[in-house]
Amino acid sequence: DNAMSMNKDKDFGTPPIDTEQMVNLEIDGFKVTAPAGTSIMRAAASIGIDIPKLCATDSIEPFGSCRLCVVQIEGGRGMPASCTTPVAEGLKVVTQNQKLAEVRRGVMELYISDHPLDCLTCSANGDCELQDMAGAVGLREVRYTPVQTHLNAEKDTSNPYFTFDPSKCIVCSRCVRACEETQGTFALTIDGRGFDSKVSPGQNEAFMNSECVSCGACVQACPTATLMEKSIIDHGQPEHAIITTCAYCGVGCSFRAEMKGEQVIRMVPHKDGKANHGHSCVKGRFAFGYATHK
C-alpha cells in the first residue's frame, strides 16, 4: 500500500556515518550505542530524543550556526552544539535542563524578533520548522522591539517554480549548503556579514539570472517559507502523499507525490529512494503538470 498520510520522514539532524566501530555513551541517562563519528544530535534522535535545531538537517553536513542544539557534557566546558560534536566513549550528555532551556529560548527570541509574525497568511501554514522550534523551546513572548529588521526585503519571484522571500530568511545556510553538497551547482552564497548577511543567488542576481538549475534542493532544505514552491502558494498545503516513481527518464527517481484530493500539489524526492537518495532534477521535482493534464 503506497498511500500514506502526510507524516514526513524523520530528520535525524546530521547524515549517517558508515563505520563498523561503535561507541557507547549516555544521553539524558539512557545508554546509547552509535557509530564512531556520529553527532550527539543524531545519536539522541536515534533513541527518540529530538534536540531542537534549525540549521541542521540530515541531508547535508552539520554547520553549527543556529546554536539551538546546544547540550552540556559532564566534565566538559560550555555548551557545545550537538550537531557538530561527535559521540565519544563514556560521554554523559544532558540535552534538557533549566540552563539549556533558557539559552535556547534566548536564541529563539532573537530569531523571532526579526521575523514576520504573519503565520495566519503564510504559505508554510504550519509546515515550518521555525514555528515548531518556537514551540519546542517554550517561547511564549518576544521582548525585543527591533530597531532594524529585514521585514521589508523584496521578494524574488523570477523563478517559475518557487519564490524567494528574504524577509522570512533566518540565514541558516541550509539552502546554500544543499546547492553545494546535494546539487553541486554552487549557485547560492551568503553575502555580507553579521546583520547584513543574506542569501544571494550568483552575484546578487535574481534566481533566474544566476547559475540555478531549478532542481529544488534549496526549497526542500529551507526550514521556513523563505523558499517556497509556487504550487503550494497557489493551492495550499497538501493533505496526503503517495510514494511513486518519476516517469521522465531511466534513472527511476523515487518521489513523494503530495496531494490534495486527486490533485498533485508538490513532488518531493523520497529520502529512501535507492536511485536518487532524496534529490532530483527540475523535471521530476517541478514539471509534474502532465500527470493531470486534460
Predicted features, each with a name:
Residues 2-35:
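Generic start-of-chain signal for non-secretory N-termini
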Residues 23-89, 98-103:
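N-terminal cofactor/phosphate-binding cores enriched in small/glycine residues
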Residues 31, 187, 254-256:
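Short, surface-exposed charged micro-motifs
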Residues 35, 98, 102, 170, ...:
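Conserved active-site and cofactor/substrate-binding residues in soluble primary-metabolism enzymes
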Residues 260-294:
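Cofactor-/ligand-binding subdomain signature composed of acidic, glycine-rich
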